[in-house]
Amino acid sequence: MGGMGGGSSIAGVLSAFGGAASGISEIPEIFRIAASACTGPGHYIFQLYEWLCIQVERVPFHSIVAGRPEMWKIGVFYVALGIRYVWSVGEARDNLERKGIFLFPKEWNAPGKNSVFIAVAVVFLVVQPVHGFQSWFLDVGQGDGVFLRTRDEAILSDCGSSQDKKIGKNVLEPFLKSQGIRTLDWILVSHADADHTNGIEWLLKEEADIRVRNLALPAAGKGQEAYKKLETLARKRGAEVYYLHRGETVRAKSLALRCLYPEAGETPAEERNSHSLVFDVTYGKFRMLLTGDIGVEDERKILAVEEDKKREKVTLLKAAHHGSNGSSSEEFLECFSPAFTVLSYGEGNTYGHPAPEAVERLEQTGTEIWRTADSGAVNVWTDGKRMYIKGYKKQDYGKKRDKKQIKN
């Protein structure tokens, strides 16, 4: 009651100041300063409340990240809860027990057993086992955001948007929490353009619920202010920071992530796209290329050292630079021959992505193209032998759910 009384007192003070300001504002111009003086305290009290709420949100473990359970689990939970309730209080239980029929052990009717039952049911609802390898190409508008997950690791590769400046709060945070993610083992930054990083910056600055263990940046960008900023933010969160180049690998238990680009010792280019990190990700027979925003010249450099891989087809390609005409060259596509390609871009973007010429080159390879602007987030699942791919917008939900054998 004391807390309520305190709240009522503050509300009364705010009302008094507001009423005074309203009355004074009806008086001629010279009294407007007095009205401002009356509204000022209320404004600052609200600011104090907002600041206190923000500080509480930054306290570690102030909330539990449980994830979003599947619909069938929610259904089972409520059915079990209903049966347990009816059995606890209903006449049906008494009639059956007289006949020696027990739906639940007798001990379950002891005081406190309902709490145990509910606790077990909640654990069933919250625990979300991960099977195989899943990739999500997030619907971030004009930008990139890829999330990789196995039973052993959670990895974010880029997250940014030039169409939504609050992509971290609006898309990244809700998505990660819906998956029950409390720790990101790696954040991979292909390059430091805002349409690949502003969501990551927000996460490192504002999101205290999600721990970040490691941050990978392109070696060719070391020393540039944009990368220094990301490095500083990550280290403040207790993360290790690595600058990677071709030939290095990302430590992961279930996945193999090999860096194909940039070259070691490459001079930082003013155009960040050309030193994007490129990763070859493999899980069993499934193989995926994450290409950042590399251009045709960068693709040629990769091809020059990937001759031995030409016979190994790529299952899925994240098309470079949102489908720009300056990427996805004919030689590159012919070399890796992807079965599926994801184009990440925003509808109506000012860059004209994807370029019709790039789309035509992709279509000529026979690849199946998925577009985040059309399908929303694109989800790919594989057990290393089979896979499926689906979109999350209404017209695509459930499409391509049939598992296909992976061919190399």
Language-model features: locations:
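Non-globular, low-confidence helical/coil segments that flank catalytic cores
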Residues: 3-408
